[in-house]
Amino acid sequence: MFMLQIADYIAENYRGKVVEVGIGRFTAVAELLARRGFEVFATDVVERRAPEGCRFYVDDVTKPNLKIYEGASLIYSLRPPPELFSAIVEVSRKVGADCLIKPLYGDYMEARIVNYKGAQFYLIRRENYD
């Protein structure tokens, strides 16, 4: 399943604080990263159970509380709706974090595609923001 590969990719390439946008009910990546020593923040527009080892915040990425995201090395989202892609990238740009988006099959955005151990996702590095 792609979630393990994405957790491995993040663990191999990032340190410290990471933020998952729109965590929903699929908390495996956040929980795996927390177990690996990451400071994991998770957000959603509705109240959710905080994944083990994570901090949860109700936040709307289209009207974000930037304090939640500040200091993150990576902001990532797993299968967000395409209408949120630009908001996720914009929050990442504003706080100087890399941005990783794993879209639903067939969703497209203008960004570099990474194929890591069979998991495909978009990655925008902080140095590539306009």
Curated annotation (Swiss-Prot):
Belongs to the UPF0146 family. This is UPF0146 protein AF_0739.1. The lineage of its organism: Archaea, Methanobacteriati, Methanobacteriota, Archaeoglobi, Archaeoglobales. It comes from the Archaea.
